[in-house]
């Protein structure tokens, strides 16, 4: 299941998003639905959703700031912005943040929305498969060789793009004589 977080300060818009499609039927799990962007960030940090769908203009932490905070926190979370505004400045900022899509709320309808998120779902699944393959290949290489801890650390640091947190790197290095340890890191 692809984990999704929905964020919109307008309760009716949020309810519409929550019910626009049958999320579970299409392979999505709603891990959070909130009108509060600060709460959304806390949910993000705890549950690491694969996809965040957020309004852009919200009081307090707006969608752009939320997207920026998510990018700074790390990970490969996909972000889709919704907005009632055709403001080109928002679009430019969203592009700078690497946002996956920007949809005007006035254009939001079930079939088009479903096509967009199913396309994102395919991308997420491909990324997870590639990441899993990369992690497995690197760890198998590490465990096949009889090398020093320092070399292990160098290899792991060079392969930082696989997205493991540093604490896992050190677990791997300290447990390098246990070939099946990498099974714990499958995503």
Predicted regions and their residues:
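Short helix-capping segments at alpha-helix termini
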Residues: 23-27, 73-75
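CheY-like receiver
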Residues: 41-132
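A generic structural motif
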Residues: 25-30, 47
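Interdomain helical linkers/hinges and coiled-coil/dimerization scaffolds
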Residues: 92-95, 99-187
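Conserved acidic segment of CheY-like receiver
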Residues: 2-13, 17-18, 52
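Conserved Asp/Asn-Gly motif in the active-site loop of CheY-like receiver
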Residues: 31-38
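Hydrophobic/aromatic residues located in beta-strands of well-ordered beta-sheets
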Residues: 4, 30-31, 79
């Amino acid at each position: 299941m692809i984990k999704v977080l929905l964020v919109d300060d307008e309760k009716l818009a949020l309810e519409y998003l929550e019910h626009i499609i049958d999320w579970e039927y299409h392979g999505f799990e709603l891990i959070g639905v909130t009108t509060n962007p600060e709460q959304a960030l806390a949910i993000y940090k705890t549950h690491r959703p694969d996809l965040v769908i957020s309004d852009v203009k919200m009081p307090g932490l707006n969608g752009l700031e939320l997207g920026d905070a998510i990018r700074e926190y790390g990970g490969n979370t996909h972000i889709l912005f919704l907005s009632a505004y055709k403001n080109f400045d928002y679009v430019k900022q969203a592009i700078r943040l690497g946002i996956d899509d920007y949809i005007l709320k006035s254009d939001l309808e079930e079939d088009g929305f479903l096509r967009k998120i199913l396309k994102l779902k395919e991308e997420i699944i491909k990324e997870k498969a590639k990441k899993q393959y990369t992690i497995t290949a690197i760890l198998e290489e590490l465990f096949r060789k009889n090398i020093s801890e320092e070399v292990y650390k160098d290899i792991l640091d060079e392969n930082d793009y696989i997205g493991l947190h540093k604490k896992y790197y050190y677990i791997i290095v300290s447990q390098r004589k246990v070939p099946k340890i990498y099974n714990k890191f499958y995503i």
